[in-house]
Every structure is written in C-alpha cells, then in structure tokens.
Amino acid sequence: MRALVIVDPGPASPPPETLPALLEAMAAWRDRWRSQMEMFEFFAGRGGGWGVFNVDDIGLSQAMMEFPFSPFSTIAVHPTVDGDDALSRFTQTTKEMLAQMGGG
C-alpha cells in the first residue's frame, strides 16, 4: 500500500531540553524506515513535513507508532492509488452511472 503521510506540529511543542534526544531518535527512525519510504520531505519555513510510504497496513501503523514526534504532532495518513488507474476507473464508473440514470 502506498500512503501519503502529512505531519504538522500539534498543539503542544516538545520541551526544548528534549529536542536533542528527539532529533537523534528521528534520525534513527528515518534510517529504520528509509527503505520503505519513497519520499521524505520537510516543509520549508515551518514545522512539519511529509513522506510517501510503500508498506503494508501493519508496517505503516508500526512506523507511525514509532515516530518520535508523534506526541507533538498532528498526523494525517492518506492511502493513494495510481493516478492513471484511478482516472480510468472513475471515468468508467461515471459512464456506467450516467447510463443507468438515462444520461449517457
């Protein structure tokens, strides 16, 4: 499964004295999940970032549970499908629905 994961800063920031340890943990987390991430990006000029995972549901859940900044973040997970395949399927489904409604 491919999924876009968007991480934004949450309502509570980590205590400043915890940042060095959190950043070390973040680097280790990235190394652990690197092979299953197609993209790994930070937002320019603000907190947060995004990544594209290619992993099964259990693996994605595990990665998010292990994410060091999760207590201080809002995380959105969006499963994705191939765009060309989705467009083709949506076009076909729309044609079928319109035909059933007498409009196609």
Where are these regions (language model features)?
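Conserved, structured core segments of small domains
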Residues: 1-104
